[in-house]
Amino acid sequence: MPLPSFLEVYEGLISTSSISSTDARWDEGNEQVIAKLADWLSALGFSIQIEQVAPNKQNLIAKLGSGEGGLLLAGHSDTVPFDEGRWNYNPHALTQVNNRFYGLGTADMKGFFAFIYEAVKNVDWSKQTKPLYVLATCDEETTMLGARHFTENAPFKPDYCIIGEPTSLVPIRAHKGHVANAIRVTGKSGHSSNPALGVNAIEIMHEVLFALMQLRDRLIKEYHHPGFEIPTPTLNLGHIHGGDSPNRICGCCELHYDVRPLPGISLDGLDNLMHDALREVQQKWPGRIELVPLHDPIPGYECAHDHPFIHGISEICEQEAQTVNYCTEAPFLQQVCPTLVLGPGSIDQAHQPDEFLAFEFIDPTVRVLSRAMQKYCF
């Protein structure tokens, strides 16, 4: 049976829905897309290992060749949900219009596996000395469960890893982390005609906000990384809700905020800073202020700017490595081996209606991946 074409693989990936979401109404498994990847890669000679990470959630690990070290090409197999009313094309079909591939996951980032497939076909593997690995993870768009699972249970240690997120084929060597929390203030409701009979949660939240803004100033003052366009951590107050009526003392108020820590700031250290910032107001209002994570925190990531892997990939891409502010699975895979983020398409298309990947990325991406395979597997 002839091998499927690049286009057939791409179409198969996009037409197989694999949405992950914290909303159970949207959340799907990724088993169908993993099964397709397993079939395609095994046809190229890869050995396949599928790990059940959670119900309906799988990681795929594929290996071509033998020996130690080698190169790992990694990516996530899930996508975000979509707003059908804002799409002009079928999100679950590969539509070719305007020299672009349209569809959910074309850029972020199921399409990357089609490029791996095509690059492997283009390489003569007869003199291979080190293995090539492919990792397809689950739930990157929500909990990064797949990457966390792989890091904790990695069955091999490659020399290097490339994560194929959309970077416009510019190597990314560092990014900030992401921590999102809720602060819930519980007061005591009552009629507004007698404030003494209640405890106003909005007024307590006012004190909480002041403490967080002081923490924000402290983070800016004490932490700096010249490699980033925004060289300090950021703290954003993103959502607040409290009360239900102007003539009622507010009984509860909730704030959602996020922090984007620089590489090198430990998650435990940041957590301690946040609790220190709130300690005084919590002591003033015992039992009324609760800090709750909105998702598992993601640390910052950095591959040292002078690492040989950066020099090698920059030479292949003819692009200097850069830093970005968005998050990837790199902080986890970096624990296994030196890791860079590099892939086709623009991050501007990620999580957008009418997501697309421009045709202009096709040949350069296959060329870059083929050269990386030849450099690190031979």
UniProtKB/Swiss-Prot annotation:
Please give the pathway this protein is involved in.
Amino-acid biosynthesis; L-arginine biosynthesis; L-ornithine from N(2)-acetyl-L-ornithine (linear): step 1/1
Could you say which cofactors this protein requires?
Answer: Zn(2+); Co(2+); glutathione
Q: What class of enzyme is it?
A: hydrolase
Q: Where are the catalytic residues? A: D78, E140
Pfam families linked to this entry: M20_dimer (PF07687), Peptidase_M20 (PF01546)
Source organism, top-level taxon? Bacteria
What the record notes about the co-factor is: Binds 2 Zn(2+) or Co(2+) ions per subunit.
Answer whether the UniProt record assigns the keyword Heme to this protein: no
GO cellular component terms, alphabetically, are: cytoplasm
Keywords for the protein's UniProt record, in alphabetical order: Amino-acid biosynthesis, Arginine biosynthesis, Cobalt, Cytoplasm, Hydrolase, Metal-binding, Zinc
Q: Where does Zn(2+) 2 bind?
A: D108, E141, H351
Q: Please state the Enzyme Commission number of this protein.
A: 3.5.1.16
Q: How does it assemble?
A: Homodimer.
The family note in this entry says: Belongs to the peptidase M20A family. ArgE subfamily.
- Name of this protein: Acetylornithine deacetylase
Q: Which gene encodes it?
A: argE
